[in-house]
Structures are given as C-alpha cells and as structure tokens.
Amino acid sequence: MVGNVLITGGASGLGRATATAVAKAGGRPLIVDLGEPDGGFDHVRADLADREQAERAVRELAERAGGLDAVVTAAGIDACGRLEDVPADRWERVIAVNLLGTAAVVRAALPYLHRSGGKVVTVASTLGVRAFGDATAYCASKFGVVGFTRALAAELAGQVGVTLLIPGGMRTAFFDDRPDRYKPGPDARLNQPEDVASAILFALGQPRGCEVRELVVCASTETSWP
C-alpha cells in the first residue's frame, strides 16, 4: 500500500502517469500543479516558483489527507537556447521551479514524512548527469536536483527514504512548445511515462529500511546516457 502520495506536476506527463499508477495501486494521489488534473484527484493549484505557494499547497493537501506517506517531485519546465539568447527571467524561472520548487516541497513535507517514515522520490534527468549545449538552465536545475537529493539521502538516512530518479526523454507534452530544432525527431526512441511511473511505484513499494537510492530509466538508445 503506497498510501498518501503528494505529486508535483501531477496534471500532465510523468506526474499524471504517476498519479494514475498510485491510484491503481490503492493509494491516494495528492496533486500540486498550476493546471487541474483529470481523474478527480485531490489537488491544489500552486506555482512552484513561489515558495510560499508551494509550502501552503503541501500543508493543505497533507492536512486534508491526514498525513503523507510519500512525495514525488515530477514538476519541471525548460528554456531552450543559448545562454545569451534566453531572457534572464525565463532562465531563472527554470531554476526556481525545477530546483528551488523541489526543495520547497520536500522541506514542507518533511514533518509529515518523519511521522510516517515515508519516502521522497525526486525527478532529475539524464541531463542532470550529462550536459548539453543550449540547455544551460535545465542542466543547471537538474544537476542541482541530483546534488540536492544525494545530500538529502545522507541527511535523512534511517529516517525518511530518498530515491533519485534519472529519467531519459519521455513521450509527453514536455517538448511541444519548443522550437522544432529542439524537439525530438520523428524517429526518436522515447519512453512512455507510464513505464517510468512504474519504476517510481517500485521505489515507493519497498519495505521500510530498504531503499532504492538511484534509478536511471531511459530508452535503450537514449543519446543523453551514458
């Protein structure tokens, strides 16, 4: 039983697939997203770039559900382009959502996770371990998530489970708003988000004291790994 699982970005992509998987496993998805999720799941709208909004959303959902058993930080945005071409506000928003938003959500959830002996799954990227040009904001944010999560795992050892998920490209709407030159080609091998969500459920399903520390889940021909 996975219990009450708070999922950021749960209205689309990997977050939505994870929410569906949690519900199918008998758990209760609790969604934080700017958009409204389908499926009738409990949700609070919040901009993760705003720390107070993020923290308030976590507390509201946790209190509504009577606690938290896990957190999955699946929300993420991008800003493709050369550093000098991407407006500074847009560049910094990627850091704010992907990295600072992750930290804000986990921080707010920790009192509940300490009580339940729960788990955290952060979502980084293969671009968090291998850098590419025209992706400075995204790489900086996801390299940050990798470092944050590894430090968090050391900090919370024996108290709260921590898993770092490093997914490759997935067939979601994440790429839709990019210029064509930054979109995967028509023959690109991308994972289905449902397959990555099943890996998250595997990590969440481990018994207390047994942890999946890191998971790399990507297509066998993923160009950003290794």
Question: Language-model features: where?
Answer:
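Conserved glycine-rich cofactor-binding loop
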Residues: 11-12
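Substrate-binding pocket helix/loop in short-chain dehydrogenase/reductase
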Residues: 82-83, 90-92
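The beta1-alpha1 cofactor-binding region of Rossmann-like NAD(H)/NADP(H)-dependent oxidoreductases
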Residues: 46-56, 88
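Conserved NAD(P)H cofactor-binding loop of Rossmann-fold oxidoreductase domains
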Residues: 74-79
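C-terminal helical subdomain
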Residues: 158, 164-165, 184-225
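Residue(s) in the substrate-gating loop at a strand-loop-helix junction
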Residues: 125
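Active-site helix of classical SDR
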Residues: 106, 141
